[in-house]
Amino acid sequence: MVKARRQAKILELVRTRVIETQEELAAALAAEGIPVTQATISRDIKELQLTKVPMPDGRYRYALPEEPGAAAGERWRRIFREAVLTIDHSGNLVVIKSLPGTAQGVAAAIDHAGWPEMIGTVAGDDTVIVVVKPADATGEVAERLKGLMR
């Protein structure tokens, strides 16, 4: 039970605070009445699949895997930002123009997002078509995708 309580507290701390190091995490846990060793912290970080993600100031903090700034998600966003040139939509389709040879990566990034309104992607060399359902959500999906370009 102690491990479950400790790991739940770690998740809470990582969600609510900027924790940059294992030492900071250990200190935060100790302040909550949960003393731990560095080895325990290290095991918990691995089991909880915490990752380090960059902050705007260049420092890194621990994050949960599903957080928007987490490692895999950040890689997909970076691919999207660097490759996408334009986004437009018509009917239930969003058309994305990208740099030559990057459409497959862009489509994979979109698929990774897992938005329920996007039912599939088709990628060529420099164009991705996103099929949206329901059709009246297409404009919103296009705007959300444009937001990933920033």
Curated annotation (Swiss-Prot):
Give the family per the record: Belongs to the ArgR family.
Which UniProt keyword terms apply here? Answer: Amino-acid biosynthesis, Arginine biosynthesis, Cytoplasm, DNA-binding, Repressor, Transcription, Transcription regulation
Where found in the cell? Answer: Cytoplasm
Single GO molecular-function term?
Answer: arginine binding
Q: Which organism is it from?
A: Symbiobacterium thermophilum (strain DSM 24528 / JCM 14929 / IAM 14863 / T)
Query: Span of the secretion signal?
Result: none
Has the keyword Membrane been applied to this entry?
A: no
State the protein's name. Arginine repressor
Purpose of the protein: Regulates arginine biosynthesis genes.
- Which ranges does the record mark as transmembrane? none
One of the GO biological process terms? L-arginine biosynthetic process
Which Pfam families does the record match to this protein?
A: Arg_repressor (PF01316), Arg_repressor_C (PF02863)
| Pathway assigned to this chain's UniProt record | Amino-acid biosynthesis; L-arginine biosynthesis [regulation]
Give Gene Ontology CC terms: cytoplasm
